[in-house]
Amino acid sequence: MELRIVRRLIPEWGTTYGPPGEGPFPAVMILHGSEGAWSGWSHRNAVILAAHGFLAFPFGYSSGGNAWNAGSIVDHSLERSVEALAALRAFPYAGPRVGLYGVSRGAEHALLLASLMAKENKTGLPEAVAVHSPPDVVCGAFDSRSYRDSGDPGWQAWDASKRAWTWRGEGLMPTTPIEVEQYPGPLFLSHGTRDRMWSVEMTRRLEKRLQAHGRKPEAHYYEGEDHL
C-alpha cells in the first residue's frame, strides 16, 4: 500500500506534514533540540507523526545556523512560540486538539511553554505535552560555534551570563525549577537510563514533582539507552 505524506505551508511560519485529505487532523508542534532547525531531525519526526495520522509542524526557533552548523539557542522569546502554536491551531487542516512534542532542549522548551502559559492563564494552551530527555530546570544558552565536547582542546566553560529563553522580555534564570505542575493537561515523560548528556534523574524529579501535586504523568524509562 502506498504511503502518502502531504506538505502544507502555514504562511509566514513554515511547512507542516500530514496525511492526504481535507482533515482536520490532530496536530502537533515539534520543538527541536540543540541540533538546530536546519538539521532535519524535527522534520523527520514530523514525517513519522504524519504517517500515523497527525498534522505535524516542526517549529524552527534556533538562531542562525545552516546545514553544517546548528546555530544557537540564545534569548529566544517564548512569546514567539505562543504565536507559532496559535498559528498551527488556526491552520484550516488542524483539528481542535493541538499538542507539543520536544526532545532535549526542545523538551525544556515544551515544558517551559506549557507551564508559563498555564501559570498566566493564556488562551490556546496545548491539549497534551510529550517530552523525551527533558531537564527539570531552566538551562543556559547554547551556541554551537563555541560548543566542544569535554576533553576537546577548544572546550570552553559555559557562559552563565547568557540566557536561552525570555518571557515578557526577561531572561529566564538557569537552574530555576520548571514549574511543570502548573500545566493541567496530560504529560508524557521519557528518558534513557544511561543518558550521558542530561541525567535521567531530572525526569525522575519531574515525575515526583508532578506526583506531589496529585498528578499522574505517563513516564517511561528506557534501560541502557543514551540521550536520544
PLM regions: where:
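Hydrolase active-site cap/lid region
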Residues: L112-R168
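N-terminal cap/lid segment of alpha/beta-hydrolase-fold proteins
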Residues: M1-G23
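C-terminal catalytic histidine-bearing segment of alpha/beta-hydrolase fold enzymes
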Residues: G71, R204-L228
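Conserved alpha/beta-hydrolase "acid-adjacent" motif
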Residues: R196-R205
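Short beta-strand/loop motif that positions the catalytic acidic residue
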Residues: Y183, L189-H191, D195
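Short substrate-entry loop that stabilizes the transition state in hydrolases
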Residues: G23-F25, G33-N66
